[in-house]
């Protein structure tokens, strides 16, 4: 077993997927109708290489302490069939359920390819969002970190949770793109991440900029969303493993590989 020490600082605001958010049904309705709508370090040898390996690990692992304690997203709901309508569902949720049936295909699940097509159709209707488009590898990663039952696809509740977050984070992105460049600059990034519910330390911000931003430190929309989806998933994973709330977790090698390889 190895101990993952706390890495982040401060308190995140309320994140997560509470409710569908304003205009979600309209956005997807527009999509259907056509309306506008730093990589890991090399392994050290045995014995004397342990200290170096741990220092590298400490700089890479996004272990979550105080920030995770104050980040309280709703858990991804259990998978249910899209047609299982609950009596207390709002009309907006029911409308989303009907649209999901059109988007998901015959198996009523959203694959990485289907997610990529959906997201790229949406962003083409928002010329103010600078993006190279959502690639298949990005969408595979997004599906993996949201795939609570490891089917390789997103069911209705999983997709609804993801979509709700994307809509919320799109609003944050536009709010903090103060120079209207279509990107988030390195100076705008901390405020944007805090508004999205994540308050990180400077070291992790620098890591994120190197991983998700261009050479000028600017982050476009697809990288912004991809990064936040990953952060949300890592926060939730850490909180689920930190059962006693100490800000530390212990995982064995199999648990670590499962957590990191399918993401």
Curated annotation (Swiss-Prot):
UniProt keywords, alphabetically: Acetylation, Calcium, Cell membrane, Cytoplasm, Membrane, Metal-binding, Phosphoprotein, Repeat
Gene Ontology CC entries for this record: calpain complex; plasma membrane
Primary location recorded for the protein, binned into one broad class: cytoplasm
Keyword Acetylation attributed: yes
Residues reported in the UniProt entry to bind Ca(2+) 4: 132, 220
InterPro entries per the UniProt record, alphabetical: EF-hand-dom_pair (IPR011992), EF_Hand_1_Ca_BS (IPR018247), EF_hand_dom (IPR002048)
SUPFAM superfamilies: EF-hand
Top-level taxon in the UniProt lineage: Eukaryota
Function text: Regulatory subunit of the calcium-regulated non-lysosomal thiol-protease which catalyzes limited proteolysis of substrates involved in cytoskeletal remodeling and signal transduction. Essential for embryonic development.
UniProt-recorded name of the protein: Calpain small subunit 1
Gene: CAPNS1
């Amino acid at each position: 077993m190895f101990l993952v020490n706390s890495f982040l600082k401060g308190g995140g605001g309320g994140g997560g997927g509470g409710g569908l958010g304003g205009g979600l049904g309209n956005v997807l309705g527009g999509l259907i109708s056509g309306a506008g709508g730093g990589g890991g370090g090399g392994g050290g040898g045995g014995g004397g290489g342990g200290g170096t390996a741990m220092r590298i690990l400490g700089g890479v692992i996004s272990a979550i302490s105080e920030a995770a304690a104050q980040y309280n997203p709703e858990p991804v709901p259990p998978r249910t069939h899209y047609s299982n309508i609950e009596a207390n569902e709002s009309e907006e949720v029911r409308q989303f359920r009907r649209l999901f049936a059109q988007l998901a295909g015959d198996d009523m699940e959203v694959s990485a390819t289907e997610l990529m097509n959906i997201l790229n159709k949406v962003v083409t209707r928002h010329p103010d969002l600078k993006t190279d488009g959502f690639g298949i590898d990005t969408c595979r990663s997004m599906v993996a970190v949201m795939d609570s039952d490891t089917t390789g696809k997103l069911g209705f509740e999983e997709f609804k949770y993801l979509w709700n977050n994307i809509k919320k984070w799109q609003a944050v992105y536009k709010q903090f793109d103060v120079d209207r460049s279509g990107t988030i600059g390195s100076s705008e990034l901390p405020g944007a991440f805090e508004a999205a519910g994540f308050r990180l330390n400077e070291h992790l911000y620098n890591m994120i900029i190197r991983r998700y931003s261009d050479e000028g430190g600017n982050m476009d929309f697809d990288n912004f969303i991809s990064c936040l989806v990953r952060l949300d998933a890592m926060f939730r994973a850490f909180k689920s493993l930190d059962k006693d709330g100490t800000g530390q977790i212990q995982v064995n090698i199999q648990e670590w590989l499962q957590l990191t390889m399918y993401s």
